[in-house]
C-alpha cells in the first residue's frame, strides 16, 4: 500500500539530543509574521492568520471585527495558539457569539498558562529580546523559552519577539519598567 504519512511532534523533540538522527527530514513550520522587525504591521500575515481563524469559525460567530483582530494579535502568528484561543473562546462564551469580554478572558486564560512557569529571569530576558529583536538569545534559557512558545521566532530565526499574551502579564510589565 502506497501511503504518505505526516507526523507532528512538539518542537522540543527537534532539539532533544536523545532522538537526534532517528527521524527523517523534518520541516518546522514558521510563525506567520504579523509585524515586521520594525514593528510595522505585515498585512499579508494578518490576512493569512485571519483566514485560518475564519476557516474554523464563521465570521458571524464573532461580535465584531475587533474581536477577530484581538485574537489574531494575541496568537503571535502561531496557528496552534490561534486555534487554542478560539477553543477557549468557545468554552468561555456565555451565549452563541464571541464578544470582546470573552476574547479577553480567553487571552487571560492562555496568559495564565505561561505565568505558571515563567520566572523573573525569563521576563527580564524576554524584555531584553523585545527591545533588541536581533539579540535572539541562544543560551539555554532562550532556547527553553523558544521551545515552550514564550519566545516566537520569525524570518527563519533572524529575529524573535515574546508571545503577545506574555506581554499582558504583570511579571513582564514589571520587568519592562526596569
How would you describe each model-predicted region?
Residues 59-74, 79-178:
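C-terminal alpha-helical "lid" subdomain
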Amino acid at each position: 500500500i502506497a501511503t504518505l504519512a505526516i507526523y507532528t511532534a512538539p518542537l522540543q523533540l527537534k532539539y532533544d539530543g536523545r532522538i537526534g538522527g532517528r527521524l527523517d527530514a523534518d520541516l518546522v513550520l514558521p510563525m506567520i509574521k504579523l509585524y515586521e522587525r520594525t514593528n510595522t504591521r505585515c498585512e499579508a500575515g494578518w490576512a493569512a492568520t485571519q483566514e485560518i481563524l475564519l476557516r474554523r469559525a464563521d465570521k458571524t460567530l464573532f461580535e465584531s471585527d475587533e474581536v477577530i483582530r484581538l485574537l489574531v494579535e494575541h496568537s503571535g502568528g502561531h496557528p496552534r495558539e490561534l486555534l487554542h484561543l478560539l477553543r477557549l473562546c468557545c468554552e468561555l462564551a456565555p451565549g452563541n457569539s464571541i464578544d470582546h469580554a470573552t476574547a479577553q478572558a480567553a487571552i487571560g486564560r492562555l496568559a495564565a498558562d505561561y505565568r505558571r512557569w515563567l520566572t523573573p529571569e525569563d521576563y527580564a530576558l524576554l524584555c531584553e529580546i523585545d527591545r533588541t529583536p536581533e539579540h535572539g538569545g541562544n543560551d539555554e534559557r532562550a532556547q527553553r523559552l523558544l521551545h515552550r512558545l514564550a519566545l516566537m521566532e520569525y524570518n527563519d530565526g533572524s529575529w524573535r519577539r515574546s508571545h503577545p499574551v506574555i506581554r499582558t502579564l504583570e511579571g513582564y510589565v514589571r520587568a519592562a519598567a526596569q
